């Protein structure tokens, strides 16, 4: 049995891509997209009809150019999601504009709009996850959305404080990042790490065990991998979202895969939820998490703006 098939027996495998052909090839349960993946997918020729449809939709909705641009980017993200949902049996994650990461109300409004576009296309809420950056404001937005039956995927998660606050808010799923944590430590500590000592692996392992220890139902979906070793070291995690090159590497490897995450300890009483002040104090004790959350939001916002430039030229 290859490692990808072995992994599927202990973990739900998700494709981290907007590339429909790659998704078709590796047959994941779910798929995740983000502004950067939507931007790169939009450059593929087979996506031209989806872009054209988004432009037509936007023009039919408003005569205002600025509003057309907003409507076109939302519709394009949903169009790509709809194509992916024809292939995956589970859920698609579609991301809220990263520029709303510190605005609870705008995040909620955008999430409702994206869900509405999916619903208009005949897709029920139980096939969609709304991706939101795991800022305090984003977590509060997710708490409200979850109560409305809109499940959320809290992303750009780098600290234990972020993970704890998400669980306490009743968030459906979190995406703790592995590879970007490794990137920070390699750049700042100037050293290499074996897979078992990888700071990203250690972080996700701690989050997974914390959730199981306190019986939180929030799903842990490891994300952002730099190598196969990071994946195999957290085999057994609830879900893992993996880019096509690493799905390929797993499918081509027949090395034995051992389950690494499998909490068997006692279940403890949950602590009182973090206050906003406690959240910021704990999150800001971790310079890596502070750097990578801010950088991740900036990068997604830059790619959102590049996508807008591409769409604006067509409006």
From Swiss-Prot:
The keyword Transferase applies. One of its GO terms (molecular function) is transaldolase activity. One of its GO terms (biological process) is carbohydrate metabolic process. It is an enzyme of class 2 (transferase). It catalyses: D-sedoheptulose 7-phosphate + D-glyceraldehyde 3-phosphate = D-erythrose 4-phosphate + beta-D-fructose 6-phosphate. Its EC number is 2.2.1.2. Keywords: Cytoplasm, Pentose shunt, Schiff base, Transferase. Disulfide bonds: none annotated. Pathway: Carbohydrate degradation; pentose phosphate pathway; D-glyceraldehyde 3-phosphate and beta-D-fructose 6-phosphate from D-ribose 5-phosphate and D-xylulose 5-phosphate (non-oxidative stage): step 2/3. GO terms for cellular component: cytosol. It is found in: Cytoplasm. The active site is at residue 131. Signal peptide: none annotated. It comes from the Bacteria. Pfam families: TAL_FSA (PF00923). Transaldolase is important for the balance of metabolites in the pentose-phosphate pathway. Homodimer. Belongs to the transaldolase family. Type 1 subfamily. PANTHER family: TRANSALDOLASE (PTHR10683:SF18). This is Transaldolase. It comes from Haemophilus ducreyi (strain 35000HP / ATCC 700724).
């Amino acid at each position: 049995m290859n490692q990808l098939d072995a992994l599927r027996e202990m973990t739900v495998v998700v494709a981290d891509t907007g590339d429909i052909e790659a998704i078709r090839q590796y047959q994941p349960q779910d798929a995740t997209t983000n502004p950067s993946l939507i931007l790169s997918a939009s450059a593929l020729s087979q996506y031209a009809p989806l872009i054209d449809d988004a432009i037509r939709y936007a023009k039919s909705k408003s005569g205002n150019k600025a509003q057309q641009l907003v409507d076109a980017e939302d519709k394009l993200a949903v169009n790509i999601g709809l194509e992916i949902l024809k292939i995956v049996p589970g859920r698609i994650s579609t991301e809220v504009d990263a520029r709303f990461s510190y605005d609870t109300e705008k995040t909620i409004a955008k999430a409702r709009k994206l869900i509405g576009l999916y619903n208009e296309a005949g897709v029920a809420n139980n096939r969609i996850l709304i991706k939101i950056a795991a800022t305090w404001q984003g977590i509060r937005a997710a708490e409200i959305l979850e109560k409305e039956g809109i499940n959320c995927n809290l992303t750009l998660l780098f600290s234990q404080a972020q993970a704890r606050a998400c669980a306490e808010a009743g968030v459906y799923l979190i995406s703790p990042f592995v590879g970007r944590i490794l990137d920070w430590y390699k750049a700042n500590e100037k050293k290499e790490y074996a897979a078992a000592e990888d700071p990203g692996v250690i972080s996700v392992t701690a989050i997974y065990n914390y959730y199981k220890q306190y019986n939180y139902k929030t799903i842990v979906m490891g994300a952002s991998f730099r190598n196969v070793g990071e994946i195999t070291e957290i085999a057994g995690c609830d879900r893992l979202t993996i880019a096509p090159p690493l799905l390929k590497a797993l499918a081509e490897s027949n090395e034995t895969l051992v389950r690494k995450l499998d909490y068997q300890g006692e279940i403890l009483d949950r602590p009182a939820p973090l206050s906003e002040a406690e959240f910021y104090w704990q999150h800001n004790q971790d310079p890596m998490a502070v750097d990578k959350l801010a950088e991740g939001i900036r990068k997604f916002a830059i790619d959102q703006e590049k996508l807008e430039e591409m769409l604006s030229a067509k409006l």
